[in-house]
A protein has these predicted regions:
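NAD(P)-dependent Rossmann-like dehydrogenase/reductase catalytic/cofactor-binding core
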Residues: 264-316
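Predominant activation on well-ordered alpha-helical scaffold segments within soluble catalytic domains
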Residues: 18, 131-138, 178-182, 228, ...
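C-terminal substrate-binding/catalytic lobe of Rossmann-fold NAD(P)-dependent oxidoreductases
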Residues: 12, 18-19, 24-45, 51-58, ...
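N-terminal Rossmann-like NAD(P) cofactor-binding subdomain of oxidoreductases
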Residues: 1-171, 268-270, 304, 313-316
Length: 316
């Protein structure tokens, strides 16, 4: 049994972490801190989650590490090199000495590094869908990826609005997640996020990137088959990342992945480009449950330990 602490336990990600940890029989939450109160002692914790904004994470991470805790940061403070963080987030990094030991917390790609880490930077919600979609396609696609993605309002840490209201708030390379997407996918990214104010959760990322000359020479269905095979091969027996196809009876959408720990992708080829549609729960796979997955890997446990009780872990 390990003892867990959560900074920012009353926020949406903090609440989602608590929702999952209730089902984890090898983890007990003994420390919680937010802007109004503190419960428990940090020094008694084995693992600490920072479900806080970037400035707070930079403050609390050194404290937690000094107390002997492993740290999983849910903000963007420990995902990028210092210069990229400061340029993308418009903040001065106040704990740059920790960046050299922070591991990017995407277990589908970096499980070995995470297993021996003292500190993990949990990926962002949009980057999770984009990176897992693009990274296996190196050498098969070229140029810059264009990404247009919708997210439920919980991605903006806000309550659902009663009336329909879709908000686009960034264009091109201005969003703070673009450097993260580019660094870990291996491709330049042009990104437009859209928040669906009347929807609570779910990311629907639509990615367009040019095919290599070799794949352009193939019939579209053959090129698409090779791309699907590359993604499926990259994740092998990983039950949490799947390539799916629409059928006459079912077209995949966010309702298939909300309240699951899955990321599913479908793709098509047209006029020399591949179009990938990646779907995930932004609070689950895009945040809290991936954080628990990181905790499990750091402890040497199964990635799904304790998560399968909180989420549907498969898709029909």
């Amino acid at each position: 049994m390990i003892r867990v602490g959560i900074y920012g336990d009353t926020g949406m990600v903090g609440q989602e972490l608590l929702k999952v940890l209730v089902h984890h029989d090898q983890a007990e939450v003994i420390f919680k801190q937010n802007s109004k109160r503190q419960e428990g002692e940090l020094a008694n914790c084995d693992v600490v989650f920072l479900a806080t904004k970037d400035p707070e994470s930079m403050k609390f991470a050194p404290e937690a590490l000094a107390a002997g805790c492993k740290v999983i940061d849910m903000s963007g403070a420990f995902r990028l090199p210092c210069d990229q963080f400061e340029a993308g987030y418009g903040l001065t990094h106040t704990a740059p000495e920790l960046l050299k030991e922070s591991v990017y917390g995407m277990p589908a790609l970096f499980a070995n590094e995470i297993a021996s880490a003292r500190m993990v930077g949990n990926p962002g919600c949009y980057p999770t869908s984009v990176i897992l979609s693009l990274r296996p396609l190196k050498g098969m696609v070229v140029g810059e990826a264009t990404v247009v993605a919708t997210s439920g309002n919980s991605g903006a840490r806000a309550e659902v609005e009663e009336t329909s209201n879709e908000v686009t708030y960034s264009f091109g390379k201005k969003h703070k997640h673009v450097p993260e997407m580019a660094l870990y996918s291996g491709f330049a990214v042009n990104f437009t996020p859209i928040v669906l104010r009347s929807v609570f959760a779910g990311i629907n990322a639509n990615i367009r990137i040019e095919l290599s000359d070799e794949l352009k020479a193939l019939p579209p269905h053959e090129a698409a088959g090779k791309l699907r095979a590359a993604i499926s091969s990259a994740y092998g027996a990983d039950d949490l990342v799947k390539v799916v196809e629409d059928s006459a009876d079912h077209i995949w959408g966010t309702r298939d992945v909300v309240d699951t720990h899955m990321l599913v992708m479908k793709l098509g080829v047209d006029d020399g480009f591949v179009y990938i549609n990646a779907l995930e729960d932004n609070l689950g796979k895009g945040a809290a449950s991936q954080g628990i997955e990181n905790m499990n890997v750091m402890q040497g446990w199964s990635r799904l330990y304790g998560i399968d009780g909180a989420y549907k872990t498969g898709v029909e």
